[in-house]
């Protein structure tokens, strides 16, 4: 299945300047209006659709968001839409709502990564609480992605030798041990280490180790990295 569903964002949309968006996919017009009014009444931005295909064909801003999704929809069902989003590598927390839920359906939804599964009728506050939890999850995911992206950019500014030194230092090796691993003089390792700390903007060794863990980098001892 293909569509125009695009999360690259539209001009001017940033995490800092744009509120979280609640996307709603509900085929029942009265229910869709009710949900839209509920979310707007507490200051949330809402974009509503009558079908999953309609949402797939829309261009969406890439901002913190969640999806309130009816299970039973015309054409592409809510559960199948969840699968399609995963296939398209689109990550958005999903809150399922249904008036005809059962255990297998709930299990499939939760295994697919749904944040919650609410049976109609549900309390307004119950849904609002689920939306808050879902948008917070998405905010943290995006924040983590930005952190990793920033660290990768900094790491790529290091020379191959500096990268090798960082990897070894992050394993807990002393300068003398790093020097032996790379066949360098200890004073040279100290210089490279200083460059690494500065370029990575690390305030301490512990800070550098945390960065290495976040990046998932490691070094094999006896690895000889050339300049």
Swiss-Prot record:
Stretches that traverse the bilayer: none
Highest taxon of source: Bacteria
Main location group: cytoplasm
HTH luxR-type domain boundaries: 151-216
DNA-binding region boundaries: 175-194
UniProt modified residues of type 4-aspartylphosphate: 70
A GO molecular function held by the record: DNA binding
SUPFAM superfamilies: CheY-like
Keyword Cytoplasm recorded: yes
Signal sequence region: none
Alphabetically ordered keywords of this record: Cytoplasm, DNA-binding, Nodulation, Phosphoprotein, Transcription, Transcription regulation, Two-component regulatory system
SMART domains: HTH_LUXR (SM00421), REC (SM00448)
Cellular compartments per GO CC: cytoplasm
Keyword Repeat: no
Entry's Gene Ontology BP terms: phosphorelay signal transduction system; regulation of DNA-templated transcription
The Response regulatory domain, residue ranges: 21-135
Pfam families: GerE, Response_reg
Localization, UniProt: Cytoplasm
Modification after translation, per record: Phosphorylated by NodV.
Functional description taken from the UniProt entry: Member of the two-component regulatory system NodV/NodW probably involved in the regulation of the transcription of genes involved in the nodulation process.
Name of the protein described by the UniProt record: Nodulation protein W
Natural source organism: Bradyrhizobium diazoefficiens (strain JCM 10833 / BCRC 13528 / IAM 13628 / NBRC 14792 / USDA 110)
Gene: nodW
